[in-house]
Amino acid sequence: MAALCEEEQVFLEPEDISLKIVETDSDSGQGSCEMADQNKLLGCVEDKDTDDEILVRKKSKKKEVLVDSDSDEELEMRNFADNVKGHSDNEENEETMSAYREKPRKIRSAVLDSDNSDHELDVQISTSQNAAEIPESEHDSLEKETHTVKPKTSKSLKKQTDTNKEEIVKNKSKRKIPKEKIKRRTKQKSKAVAEARPNLNDSGCLLTDGDLFDNGVENEMDSNEEEDSLEAIRAKMKSKLNSHSAENFEDFELDTEGNQESPEKRKERKAARLGKEAMKQMHSETQRLIRESSVSLPYHLPEPKTIHDFFKRRPRPLCQGNAMQLIKSTKYQPCTEEKKKPNEEICAEVPEFDYVSKEDLEISPEQPLLNTQCSHAAVLCVVQNDARTEGLSKSTEAVVTGQMNDHEDAFSDSNIVHEQETVGLITVTETFQTPFIPQPESVVCEQIQNDVVEMQRMPEQPTHKPKLSKLEKLKALGVDLSIKPRLCPDDGSFVNLDEPKPNKEFEALKERFLKHTLQKSKPRTERKVNLNIIRKETTADGKEELKADVVPIVMATEKPDKSIYQKPGEKLQVLKVKLQEAMKIRRSEERLKRQALYKLDNEDGFEDDEEEEEMTEESEDDGDGNAETADYPGGEDEEEVGDAEDDNDEDDTVNDRLLGNVPEIVIPLPRPVTTDSSLMLFKDNSSKLGDSLPDESGCKRSSRLEYEEDSLLPQLKENSHNSSFELISSMIPSYQPCNKTTRVVINSNNLGFRSPSPVHFKTSFLSSASKSSGKMSEPSLPVEDSQDLYNASPEPKASYLCAGRNSQFQFSLEDDTQSQLLDADGFLNVGRHKSSSAKHRLALDTMDENAMDANMDELLDLCSGQFKESLSGTSQAAESDAKKQPMDELLELCSGKFVSQADCSTQDSSASAKDRSTAVKKDISDEVATVSSSFLTEREQEEDEEEEFGEFKLLPCDDSESENEEQNEEEEEEEDAKDDEDEEEILQKQQKRKLRLNDFMEDEAELSGSDVGSGDEYEGDDDEYEEEAIDEDLPSDEELQDQVNKIHMKVTMDEDQRQLRFYQERYLADGDLHSDGPGRTRKFRWKHLDDASQVDMFRRDSELEEVDGENEETEETELKWRKERFEREQWLREQPQGSRDNNEEEEEDIGEDSQFMKLAKKVTAKALQRKVSTETNEPKKPGPRNPYEVIRPFSLPKLRTGSLLSKPKEVLQKLAAVSDLNPNAPRNSRNFVFQTVSPGKKEETTDKPRSKVRKNIAVAMPSPKRFKRDSTPTVKSRSIFQLLE
């Protein structure tokens, strides 16, 4: 029983109180302790690492009463005094107890159950088990008390004896005074301890509103204690203890070891268990009410982080050692505390946390263990169970005195873990070896009072932690600071203090990179340039000489270009913007010029003036948009060239040089003859119906045209439109089908149509010489340009090359690429060829041979329709191949006729006839639509006549006579032009609007008769033109001959083909030469069809008929013939051995008058006679007739295929009988020798030999891939090839 007494006296250590863990049997989770500091948590981990301590955990056998009222506490103090007094009377047991006390014990305060409320924790005590000798009766009474102290539990207590009551009353006055003092001090210290410990809740979190939990539990506990009448319970307990006081002390150890064997105690334990369950139920109900109540709990609000916090590196500890040592180290914890301060500040803002201060939650890690203990609990709180016996007063006094001494010695003898911090459950190893000295009760009380006063006077150490320097932190982390870094090599290595060798390639790469990235245009400073010039000097003799001279020129400083392009491609974009702006300016200027010309053209009054003006504006807008698309790519090409140059000015100088090197050529160009589809939009479209007459003066150009051309040249130089792309897009004609040949004047005597003014152009400027339709002139309708964009394959017309002001069109349309530079004979079109046809030599006034070759290279490619990429618009683009070709080849290509120079004059008439015949079938509108020329008045032609001869001219020969002849011809043309001018102007004005509308029409308009002229047209002098138009419509005799020959040949070929097929059908079997379709066409016959059904014969060659495209009459005749043939074959089957005379009569019906047929009949008759005689001589067994077999008299021996559908029924029945399965036979009979045969089938076997059966099987089942022919054909073959052998 002594062990029980020792456990009942519990020494309350202040740190144990602050961190007591209550074990709860319920699932509420209450009792989990919250640490105010993370150091305490880590300390718990480190406690387990120490080897000096052995954690002994004993489940307490006692349940302590809640100290709620004053009466309870008075009763406890009285029992305490009785124990002290009784202890002093029993001094004979000192030796036994001192021996028991001298055993060293390591005690950890027992972890109590959570049956009691939180207030029970405040009075919980951990004790050092040091007890004096106690009589056996006292131990028995204490043992019984341990199990009966619980409120609501002990219902089976014995009645109290009268002696016990008297003793209690007698000792009341003695105990009262000292115990009241102890009670007050205990209350004060328990309050201080309660403030220092962390509050517990049922979820393991810090319950800051402690009143909510404590008050609820305490109120329920108070009410329960009032109901159960605590005073009555205490009286029962005391009576029970007194009844057992007389038992012997000798049985102390036995009772201590076997205290669970007594039946009385078992009954009391049953009652205690019931009380414990009732406390559990009450506690769980309390926890349920608390859980269901609405509490505003402050949740953890993390500090909002900025984006910079996420990119910061985590601070890594710069120390040695593994990670666990860093985590356990004391110096590593302040950084974690600093992180938690903001969160605690947030929690402090909530008003429910006001009474929980930060100092209460934190304990300074540097505060010594003794001071912390003294500051929190100054006195030893000795709490015993409520029921005490009177006889224990003396022994209890000795116990208290021994405990005080042992407690004072404990701080000197115990091993304290983590001296600089207080963490977790602090386990103190106490060795009680001091001798037991009994002291009177007054001494004990005085010592307790003095200890309380001293501990209250001791000042609390400040909680602020002094800042440590980096060196101290490193020392605390275990870094050896005595080692200093040095520049020394390790073992086996060396330190190279020399500078590394420079990497030349890397440096060059950096320089190159910097050169490209940091390139700056250097401003050109003032400098001197030597300019080579040529001066004329007159000598003393009066002769002029050319002398070369050098003139120094001082170039001024150039300002650097301010626009420094930083981005790639920026310069190109800027150039594009500049180009577009220049194009807008140029289009606006040209629009103004066209408007002025239009007004001048329509001054003499046109009926539909306003309407025509609107249409013109629309067409101009569309034409401009299309011209922009045509010009723009050329600009891009030049911009790429400009990127390679330093400045844009250099581009202009290069173009100036190119243009300066090439002399200017004046080529008189053919002009188009106006049809209904030609364009009469503007004044300069001066294609006239009277141009067929050689009357107009050649080689004239107006001042207005010169002005336009001169104003256009610098812009074109600036924008550099000399690209092949623009040449193709602007000069390739759009296909405008308008097959109309109305009122076209063609004079057969004149092969070429003369023009009043030849086009003046430069060859290097050739590609940019057309804006929308060969722009030296104004653009025409939008159809010309817009169709270039979406026409998939436009026909390349070389006539666009020369589209100029007053151009001439050659009607030799035999070749699509007919050149307008050349006439029908293939020579350059310069004037008329009547007198100079014998002299065909090219002469240029001041052009050397190289320049001529360069120009002819372009002309050769353009006229022949070969638009290659080498055509870049400059004269140097294509020089390699064409220089080697002779001029004759050029002329032949351009004219489209490969003739020699000697035959040129003799072929004029045939060429004109060809021209007339092909002009009917060809389309003229393409060439006419793209050639726009300016209409010149008579005065303007006369004014500019003199200026035109100042330019270079293409002359037919070098002789002066040819020049004189050409001048005479031009004068004649002038006179003729004056006569016809008035008439042509009237015709032109009246046809303008109609021609413009026709351009927008398509080919379908011809079907509706829209090509017929309206009745209100001008009909004056139309008879002459209509007659000539009628003549033009007629083809030539040669063409008529060709057409008739073609038709005749087609008819005769069809007839021959039909006749040939007829003979093939008659005399050849299907396998012979004329198998038009696939040679192995299988024709299947169905089972139950008639044997005479030959439906497939009638349409066997239908595919061939469709391919050949024969007419219906031929099909009808062939169908009739096939019917006759079928009937004939059917009759032959009925009479297989009929006379040959019948067949001969049938053959005579067809082609009796043919000698070939007569000969064939004789030969076949002889051959058949021989074969019949041989067949009759050979004895033959007539086999079973195949009902499916068709006897064809004209077929080869029958081809047997592997199809079972073509077999007769008898063969199929035999095959079915042979293929019957034997059920008794083994399944894998491939390599099986013996086979069971049913006897019934042996009897049914016929007398036919087996060889015949095998033969039939072999015949019936041939290889499906090959044909097997019978050795003896059953059908008479009448193939003609057998007879001809």
Curated annotation (Swiss-Prot):
The modification Phosphoserine is found at residues 864, 895, 934. Signal peptide: none annotated. The modification Phosphothreonine is found at residue 906. Residues 1222-1238, 1272-1285 have a biased composition (Polar residues). Residues 76-90, 136-148, 159-170, 913-925, 1240-1250 have a biased composition (Basic and acidic residues). Residues 67-211, 240-271, 600-659, 770-790, 904-1038, 1130-1192, 1222-1285 are annotated as: Disordered. Phosphorylated. Phosphorylation at Ser-864, Ser-895 and Thr-906 occurs during checkpoint activation and requires the ATR kinase. Phosphorylation at Ser-864 within CKB motif 1 and Ser-895 within CKB motif 2 promotes interaction with the catalytic domain of chek1 and subsequent activation of the kinase. Phosphorylation at Thr-906 creates a binding site for the Polo-box domain of the plk1/plx1 kinase, which subsequently phosphorylates Ser-934. One of its GO terms (molecular function) is anaphase-promoting complex binding. Residues 222-248, 957-995 form a coiled coil. One of its GO terms (cellular component) is nucleus. Residues 770-780 have a biased composition (Low complexity). Residues 248-258, 603-625, 634-653, 940-949, 958-985, 1014-1038, 1143-1152 have a biased composition (Acidic residues). Residues 847-903 are annotated as: CKBD. Keywords: Cell cycle, Coiled coil, DNA damage, DNA repair, DNA-binding, Nucleus, Phosphoprotein, Repeat. It is found in: Nucleus. Residues 878-920 are annotated as: Interaction with PLK1. CKB motif repeats lie at residues 858-867, 889-898. One of its GO terms (biological process) is mitotic DNA replication checkpoint signaling. Interacts with both chek1 and plk1/plx1 when phosphorylated. The CHEK1-binding domain (CKBD) contains 2 potential CHEK1-binding motifs (CKB motifs). Phosphorylation sites within CKB motif 1 and CKB motif 2 are required for interaction with CHEK1. Required for checkpoint mediated cell cycle arrest in response to inhibition of DNA replication or to DNA damage induced by UV irradiation. Adapter protein which binds to the checkpoint kinase chek1 and facilitates the phosphorylation and activation of this kinase by the ATR-TREX1/ATRIP kinase complex. Also associates with chromatin during S-phase, and this requires the pre-replication complex (pre-RC), cdc45 and cdk2. This may indicate a role for this protein as a sensor which monitors the integrity of DNA replication forks. Belongs to the claspin family. This is Claspin. The gene is clspn.
